[in-house]
From Swiss-Prot:
Keywords attached to this entry: DNA damage, DNA recombination, DNA repair, Nucleus, Phosphoprotein
Name the UniProt record assigns to this protein: Structure-specific endonuclease subunit slx4
Encoding gene (name): slx4
Annotated compartments: Nucleus
Low complexity bias spans: 38-56, 734-758
Entry similarity comment: Belongs to the SLX4 family.
Amino acid sequence: MMQITTDFVVLSSSPETSAIHFPPLPLGNSKITSLRDPSMSLSPSPAASPTASKRSTFFSTPPYSQFKTAHKTTQDASKERTTTTKTDENSASSENGCIRRGQKSQPISQVELQNIGQDNSENKENAPTKPKRARKKQEGSRTGTEKLKNKTISGKVTKTGMSKSRTSVIKPVKSKQGTCERNTGKDGCEKDNLQLELAMARRRDWTPTKNAANPVIDLDDEDDATNRPDGLGTLLSGYEYTGMAIASDRHKVLTNSGPTKRRRIELILTHHKQLVDSRVLPAKPKSLSEDDSVQNSEGEAPICAVSKPSKKPKPKTKRLTTLTARVTAPYDLSANSSDSTVQEILGTAEASTGAKPKSRRTKRKADESPEYKVPRTLFSPEDAVKSLDQQELVFGTCSQLQREDSPDMLRDTQIAVQESEKEFTRGMGRLSHTARYSSVLSRLATQRNLWSAAARDTEGQLADVEVVDLVDSPEASKFIVSSLNNEKGTEDHSFATYSSRSSEVLQAKALAPADAPIDEALPALTSHTVEQLEYEEPKNQPITRSKPPLPYYKGKTDLQLASEVRRYGLKPPKNREKLIELLEKCWVAKHGLDLQEAREELQSKTTAGMTFSTSEPKKVEQEPYPKQAKTATQSKITKARSQFRPNVPELTGKSRETNTTTAVVKEDKQNNPKPKLKERQPNPKRSFIDVEEIQDSEDEFLPSPSAILNEFLVSPPRKGKQSNKDTKQNRQELPTSTIPSSPSPKSSLARDSSLSPTRQTKKSRTIPPVSVKRDLLDLGEQITKAVRAQPRRKQNSNPVTTGTRKRPTWHEKILMYDPIYLEDFTSWLNTEGLALVDEDREVAIGFVRQWCESKGICCCFRVKKTSERF
């Protein structure tokens, strides 16, 4: 603790010393009573004395640097034991409160100064009393402690010397008199708990100017930076939105299509001639807008611009032929008209004469446009239908329609489609017909066609579609026995070459392409047919032994047969005979038909007693290959029936055999086949005659309605007809062909197909892919014929009503989409329906259901009465 001296230095802000009054001090501790109470320091109140309120205004607060240096010098002065006191005790008390809180001097409000004045008046009146003395002691002790702490604040006065100390002391005292007046009110503010608000107010006064000026300087710097050429504002100016002028230009372009207020005002400001002309042209607002876009002051130039755009709609009407142009027409007119009218106005702006005739032109054009539109809207119904018939419609997207501007495009496309269809039909006709009885491996080795891959029959199995096209190839044309090459006569050439020399066959195999593995074996078989009739060559007999035999399906149960059918991916039928036939057909399609046909032909010989009328029948019976080759050639030739049938007469199968055998034998004996073949030009026609006879024999398995009647009712006359045809056709060269021996056993097989299952299976084995289908098709066709052949009957009405009503037939019910009960329909077919068509077979309810579903007929089973209870 520093010792406090009793010396007093009186400092005041004014020369008046009478303002300071010292009351009598009580006896006591000199250290405590050395400082005065702030209430006794000022006799008059601040409100009463005007000088007290003015003192703070004369002396400004010292700067921050002076205040800081004064604080340091006071500490030095206290070390040198310099005695400095302040006569203004109010400042001491206020500074004491600041030191207690560790804060600096705070400003004092006027309310606090008034409280100080009241305390001074009370002290004057009650000075001699004892309780006041006790209060003074407390305040004295309080000021004594404050004096110790005020050494740091009073040290603001720097005293290096006596002369300098007095001058330096005056400045902080004058400045503190105003601050002390504010700080005396701080104690009152502490009582009211208003420290935060007063702190903010105090800081406004004593805060250095640098802190307050810095943000202002920063703002000035930012403004300067924006104004500088290298500032941030110049850099960001390049990123500013400068689209105001562009938007105005766009607005002008868009508003050229119609009048606006601004344009009307401009028209009012123009000459009287323009006003008169504008009254004449109210129907075209586009022209008015286009006239004003150029802003010509001349009266006639805008009218010229008005008259010319009326010529532009003509090409636009041509563009409206497509759907895209019609949809986009209202959106494209503004841009097209604005560009065209601006150029026209610029070109005609110099012309200032001929305003009236131009206005007349616009009138005429305005009159012509509705006349051009009237007939479109006033079409009569007949004319409208005619116009629709004449119009060519093409369905597609708008982009495709827009591209088809030329009128020849549709015609070209139609012609191209027709040409492509012709090419397709030609390509289908050129396909060879020899891949039907080939093995599975040979089919995979050949070139596949999309149509053949997708072709399936009614049972879900792949249909026998022609795969290889070897007709047009020069190497394979020698070997294919086909009906498509009528003009070249390749069939008899092939027979002659094969029968004459076997070496030519080997050469042909060497020359044949790799894509024809199917047709290499079949011509070899045909060559052996002719050679075996004349020569005996048992070279190809081991081939029959290498192939597996047909399994005996009749010895298996129904479950085994159904499982075998499912292995082929087919649905097993309910009938056992159909299961066996289907399995035989699938096995033949998988393993090939050559061996199977040979075995079936041998069985058919023993059962039906069919014989060959050849010179050596024993040899023919020993060798199965002649029959195999015959059936193979027949199967190849029959596929060309549909293309050449109307121009070809008919012959029997026996005459065909004799033709081929006798012709080949004669050629082989004479050893000159080529010149004789050249001399014989009608032989290809006879080969096609054979084709037709083979197909007629197959037609008996799939008969037409007239063929069924002829077979069951008028079969003997048909034989006579066939014999007559044969005699007419083979009258000159083949007199032996008049024997009608071959069709008779086949017709008998066709008649007894429903009665004898053994013969039916034999018949199906001869041509297995077609037999089962054709039996089913026969029944389906018989059902359709029976339904259509049912006569309309009249049913008697009830006795109450009068007259009769017609009972609808099954055909009428089907046409009216009435639900057909399968039980009733099958019973009618088995009792009456099939008898109308002379059909002896009966139909199961499952087959009738399949027939109805295939025809798209609404069918259902009859609901039993027992089911209604549940």
